[in-house]
Amino acid sequence: GPMGPSGPRGIPGPPGAPGPQGFQGPPGEPGEPGASGPMGPRGPPGPPGKNGDDGEAGKPGRPGERGPPGPQGARGIPGTAGIPGMKGFSGIDGAKGDAGPAGPKGEPGSPGENGAPGQMGPRGIPGERGRPGAPGPAGARGNDGATGAAGPPGPTGPAGPPGFPGAVGAKGEAGPQGARGSEGPQGVRGEPGPPGPAGAAGPAGNPGADGQPGAKGANGAPGIAGAPGFPGARGPSGPQGPSGPPGPKGNSGEPGAPGNKGDTGAKGEPGPTGIQGPPGPAGEEGKRGEPGPIGIPGPPGERGFPGADGVAGPKGPAGERGAPGPAGPKGSPGEAGRPGEAGIPGAKGITGSPGSPGPDGKTGPPGPAGQDGRPGPPGPPGARGQAGVMGFPGPKGAAGEPGKGVPGPPGAVGPAGKDGEAGAQGPPGPAGPAGERGEQGPAGSPGFQGIPGPAGPPGESGKPGEQGVPGDIGAPGPSGARGFPGERGVQGPPGPAGPRSQGAPGIQGMPGERGAAGIPGPKGDRGDAGPKGITGPIGPPGPAGAPGDKGETGPSGPAGPTGARRGEPGPPGPAGFAGPPGADGQPGAKGDAGPPGPAGPAGPPGPIGSVGAPGPKGSAGPPGATGFPGAAGRVGPPGPSGNAGPPGPPGPVGKGPRGETGPAGRPGEAGPPGPPGPAGEKGSPGADGPAGAPGTPGPQGIAGQRGVVGIPGQRGFPGIPGPSGEPGKQGPSGASGERGPPGPVGPPGIAGPPGESGREGSPGAEGSAGRDGSPGPKGDRGETGPAGPPGAPGAPGAPGPVGPAGKSGDRGEAGPAGPAGPIGPVGARGPAGPQGPRGFSGIQGPPGPPGSPGEQGPSGASGPAGPRGPPGSAGAPGKDGINGIPGPIGPPGPR
């Protein structure tokens, strides 16, 4: 028959009792570590976590692949300025430049009058011969100082014995190239020093034949070097100049030898497999520890071997022009010099491009007259400046009439003159006899030890080292003490129901309420590792998640048993990746004002004030201080050539001690040069004889060829300061030189701090009216003084009587700039002039105060989870307890 309808659904039976807990299966094979994900940004620090029980050290995992380098950090705050370095010693003078082409022959001038003969000075003690010092760097060529007045020609001194050549030092082995140090602060460029006196001219050689230039005379024997002098005082260091371009990269050093691998520790016995306990509650994240104290700096390392000669790097940019140094102290007046001999006219300078007229500046009102400031302390001698631009040639002087002087009586013996420059080469002389070998001189005294230099700037921080290889696995720690047995668990659910007899199908009831969740069953065995998936591409970083709220602290459990002592620390894990750079910090508080910066270079000249009406003639003031001697006048044209004197008879060749020098005879004609003989024995020096009358100057020789620039010599030890000489007499004032072309306008200088008002001096005694002196050379422009306070408007005075027109007085020193007046009407725009030369760059200011550290930036998005590490070693098996609900976790035991 047909199939009947289905019966109602039966009532669900009671839940079955859980089966007994199974034992944990053996650990599966560790899976291969996956590729490292990108480094996520650093999250905010969490609350401090509770100390968990010390677990057994797991096996160290394999180090992950090194991730890509993080972004470059923001540039740090510039450090404070270092200790100023000591002033370097002056470099050796550069090689003498080529002689310029001979200028046009000038008209013969009138012969000068012979000056009064000076007194014979005492003969100085010959100093010991100094050792050759280490070669110093070649100094930069400075600005040519003003030509000093020519001194009186002294008598020709006896030629000293030839010096012994110094021993050539052995060439050192080339060491590894050292790291390039940071550049020190750039020294301030000083103003050119006062001109030194010109050396006395040597005796004149015989004139050559008409039309033929005279040959060059033989060079004199080298003099004995003086004793080393004391080192000079340390000068102030200038502001730091701009950093030059980085030098060439040094050669990489040889890789170090690999270290010995440590012995592998004994492998411990594996412990029995323990039952996995329930997971403990998640500990709170620990706070970030406070930074540790700064370590004591280590002792300085030993000095390494000298580096190999590196290849010179590209030439750095020209340094900025330093601020002009203060004027040096006034020198003692020199002795009255005899009129110098006519020099060679200089070469014609290169004609510069004509400057264009600048735009017409606005004429400001005249400022108030500044008060005379107190004289400042004498500044240190300036470093040698750079060579200036060659000046324009002066106009050709008028031809003087030939003089008709009467020969005067022979003068008294003059003071010993300085060694003159080598004269023109004379004709070859006869071959001289071969002298005997000289005795070796005593060894020179050792020089004084130099001042130790300042500590160099800190070197650049090294690159982070590569991740180290994980160390060997340590011995397994002792097993922990067995804990107390837990409390009896709650009664478990009833056991499984027995078999029931099949009853009639009942009526389907209403669905019952949802039953309570059953107790979780035992953990199953770990499955086999699945196949390794293909590493996908690195995804973009996710958005920054908001930090979660801190959870409430759970109730404290009952006190647990005292734990065992802490196990041995496990092997160090691999180094983590560098975190991303923090966000830019907030600007720091305004720092205190730093010390006043150095005075800047002189600013451009201010606008020319309006021409005032001539005032009444004032009363005669006290006599002014003695001015500096003016620059030497221009060298006049060479005088007429004198007639050649008859040759003197040759003297006999002597071997004995040197006799007294007789009166100078007439200069004889030089023979062809003979072969150089061996050095003769050093004779005892004889007494100086009276100087002969100076001869007439010979004709100008042709310019010699430029010699090869030699290697700079080693720097000698500082010489012992000699005795102070007697103060010289006041020399005659030199004629004012021609005004050179205007120099380039410098950049405006940094305004210096306002100076103190000068105290009012006591009135000096009324002096007699001085005579009008010859105008001295124009001095360098002074620094722009601070702006004076605006004066109160004066009451209108009654018009005074018109006085006689006064003479134009000497231009005074530039006073401090007055306050800026009201802006005048805009004048008509003048024609645009050609671009002028570029000014020097300003001095770099001192570094500002360091800013406050920035706040920590927001945490970035968490990166993807890394691969799961290999399972740890199995623990000891525990005692089978009654299956109960786990109790609360006890507090941690003491460490």
Curated annotation (Swiss-Prot):
Short name of one Pfam family: Collagen
Modification after translation: Prolines at the third position of the tripeptide repeating unit (G-X-Y) are hydroxylated in some or all of the chains.
Molecular function terms, GO-annotated: extracellular matrix structural constituent conferring tensile strength
Stretches with biased composition (Basic and acidic residues): 51-65
Major location (coarse): secreted
One GO term describing the cellular component: collagen trimer
Localization in the cell: Secreted; Secreted, Extracellular space; Secreted, Extracellular space, Extracellular matrix
Keyword Repeat: yes
Tissues in which the UniProt entry reports expression: Forms the fibrils of tendon, ligaments and bones. In bones, the fibrils are mineralized with calcium hydroxyapatite.
Region (Disordered) location: 1-895
Biased composition (Pro residues): 152-164, 595-607, 741-751, 787-802
Record's compositionally biased regions (Low complexity): 20-39, 98-114, 137-150, 198-237, 302-336, 348-374, 383-399, 553-564, 575-593, 608-635, 660-669, 679-703, 753-768, 823-838, 853-886
Listed GO biological process terms: extracellular matrix organization
Key words of the record: Calcium, Collagen, Extracellular matrix, Hydroxylation, Phosphoprotein, Repeat, Secreted
Chain positions with Phosphoserine modification: 90, 556
Family named by the database record: Belongs to the fibrillar collagen family.
Something else known: These protein fragments were extracted from fossils. The tryptic peptides required multiple purification steps in order to eliminate contaminants and to increase the concentration of peptidic material.
Task performed by this protein: Type I collagen is a member of group I collagen (fibrillar forming collagen).
Subunit annotation: Trimers of one alpha 2(I) and two alpha 1(I) chains.
The name this protein goes by in its record: Collagen alpha-1(I) chain
Origin species: Equus sp
Source species taxonomy: Eukaryota, Metazoa, Chordata, Craniata, Vertebrata
Designated gene of the protein: COL1A1
